[in-house]
Amino acid sequence: MQTGMLCAYFNGASGNQNQDSEVKSEKHRLMYNEYGVKMAGYVVETLADLKEIGGSGIKTTHETFVGNVDHSWDGFITQAEEVVALCEKDKTAGKQLGYGYGFSSHLHAKSIITRAGLGLTKNLEMYAFRIGDLGFISESYEMFSDAGIYIRANSPFETTIIISGNHDYIASAEAFDYRSYEADCGMFERGTAEKLAEKYVELLKAVQ
């Protein structure tokens, strides 16, 4: 019977780093291609430095985080109302306020206004587990990498692996500051990414 090392590669979502042939702008298409090639290079470098898992045993934990679906803060509603007013006249006018794409900007701005003040929430499932001396967290949404960097820096494990999905954007405070389209389009309020990061550090400590 042969034995060897099992290598698992988890590729989550962290922004547009794919080689996207559908991007119309040649400048942007080349930029995405460059990012994709760089990321592939980083993966190869990481694979060359693999280490066997130390320690033993498996431990898991799970928690449900209640996220607020409300953007009625910091002048956001006023901005959304401006976008709706502009887009009623010109469907591409959303770009003037940095709302990404004109047509989707109109829809998202209307959605923000509808949700504001309703006190809506959405449950987010959080998982953390340990395999040997490795710590893992798993989340089904696209939490910005700022939060992932914080989790790794504060994790009790020397190596922490974050398995990420793309169910919805959970933008970091920095993304909200520079009006990222993910922040505008995402469902959750500002501060959600940072709260999740803190909670994940707690879960990792629980499985240490």
What are these regions (language model features)?
Residues 1-208:
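Non-catalytic substrate/cofactor recognition surfaces at enzyme active-site rims
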